[in-house]
Each structure stands twice: as structure tokens, then as C-alpha cells.
């Protein structure tokens, strides 16, 4: 069995961060979202992985390499522009061959899904197996309609009047039958080859399409709110450890991870929080639910429930919360600040905030 990981797309909902970085590499608890998926695929016993890449191919390749760090063998499949999930399957035909495969959206975050779904698929080997989850607003997702026995009757892509609240999670399992389906469908009104249309083709052809309503956690990390929520969830599992320097005037409270080379001076850090390697925190309050990446500087400031990327600097800011701050951003004080500041700043930005 192989894996097809989709790491193209433009990440418009995470702009300006994704103007200069692949959305799949935005870190959660200081580790790129994509890496969690690759680790889950390896844990399921799959080694051969094809990664579909687009405009950010160089960045993805630099981060993942040949996959050996994950125990994987990685191949890269270029997609000239986003033309739909089914198009990703179409252009990956040579890599996939006649093998069964799992298709995994690289910007999704799932817990307790991949291993179980692969095991279930291998045991029953239907033509397609879909992972579903109940959502409060199904009109924003691909939605499945099921029979009383759980058989998939039909799929709709972002329907105006959904027939269920069961949304498609970004994990699909297919037999080689899917290749006939993606070759048979035509582009949707969006000009894309939709995977929902390909699966519907299998259903209409009388093929065996099954589903599982997952009990594990799932988030599409395509927007800031969901990124912060996933960061919170992962930080909840953080084991406290201090490999850096914390002076006697500082307090680490709860699950705080201070990585090697980090310094905390005259500050209070409330867990769960991660302080990245080489980061300096001085005269500040950080956390809870905060990730500071490597080589950041936080001084005379408060940062809570936020993700701060590599090399960012925050100085003299009374309070930042619920924020995603890009690489090498500089945030400094300026007159007349509100009590809290909510920011989404792209890489290499400069912002002035009053103290």
C-alpha cells in the first residue's frame, strides 16, 4: 500500500503568512502540520509516499527531503496549478501503479484516524473508504449521504441544502478502481476534477464505497482560528522539560518545554507552552497555549494563546493574544494601545504597537 500526500494549493485563508511559506509547513507546537501526517502514515506501516507539490515545491522538498528522517521513501509529483484532488490522483498514476493507497491532505490534522482506517481498509478492501465526521456547518464541506447500514449513497461538494451533517475528512483510501473514475469525470464549474465526483462515479457504477464516522480529532488547518485550536490541542500533550537556561527570578508553571539554547530571564511562562531553541524571553509573561519557534525574542511583553514563527521579535507590547506571527516579524511598542492585540503578520513584516 502507498500514500499520496497533497501539499500543493495556495493557502489563501492563511494569508499573509502563506505569501512566503507553504501552508503545510506552518508549525503546530513548533512542528510543521505536514510532519504530523507523515508520521501517522509511517505508524500505519506505509513507507512509499508520493507528495504532490505546487508553487511551494522547493520549500516542501527542503523540509521533507527523501523522507528518511520519517522512515519513509518519498517521491515528488509536480502539479502545475491546483486543478482538484482527483487531478492529483490522475497525475500520480505512474507512482501509484496498481497499488491500493491512502490519500491524505497535507494541511489536515487528524488524531487516531490513519492507523485505524488503513487497518480497516486492508481487512475489507472496498473500492473506496471515506472518513467522515459530524460538523455543525456542513455547507462548507463535501458531504456524504449514507444508508441506514452505513453504505455511501451519494456525495455533494459544499451543498446549499446538505442531506446530512457528515463532512469528508481529508483522508481517503482507494483501490486501483479510482483510476477509472478520475479518467471518466469532467471538470466541475470551478474548473477542477473533484474527488467527490470520482467517488460518486464509483457509487453510480455499483462499486463498493464504504465509510467510517471517526471518533478521533480532526481539523482543517486552513485558517488562523483552526491553527490556534490545533496548537492548543497538541500543546496539551506536551511533557515538561527544560534543556535551556531559566534564571532564579523566573517561574515555569505547568507543562512547559524549554528547548536547548533557549533563555528565560525574569519571566513567567504558563504551560502548556513551548519555547524554541535559541529563543530569549526576558521580563515577560508567556502562555498558556503558546508556541515560540526558534530564535525568537520576547521582551517586556505578554503573549498568550499564540503561534510565533522563527526569528520573530516582540518588544514592549502590553499584550498579544490569539495571534499568528510570521517569521522575522518585528513587533514593537507605540503610543495608545488597546488592552489586547490580535495579529496575523506575514514573514519579514514590521509592526508598531503602542505600550
UniProtKB/Swiss-Prot annotation:
Metabolic or biological pathway, per its Swiss-Prot or TrEMBL entry: Antibiotic biosynthesis; streptomycin biosynthesis
EC number: 2.7.7.24
CDD domains tied to this protein: G1P_TT_long (cd04189)
Class of this enzyme: transferase
Catalytic activity: dTTP + alpha-D-glucose 1-phosphate + H(+) = dTDP-alpha-D-glucose + diphosphate
Family annotation (Gene3D superfamilies): Hexapeptide repeat proteins (2.160.10.10), Spore Coat Polysaccharide Biosynthesis Protein SpsA, Chain A (3.90.550.10)
Record's keyword annotation contains Magnesium: yes
Domain of life (superkingdom): Bacteria
Cofactor, how bound (note): Binds 1 Mg(2+) ion per subunit.
RNA-binding keyword on record: no
Protein role: Involved in the biosynthesis of the streptose moiety of streptomycin. Catalyzes the formation of dTDP-glucose, from dTTP and glucose 1-phosphate, as well as its pyrophosphorolysis.
NCBIfam families documented for this protein: rmlA_long
Family to which this protein belongs: Belongs to the glucose-1-phosphate thymidylyltransferase family.
Protein name: Glucose-1-phosphate thymidylyltransferase
Organism: Streptomyces griseus
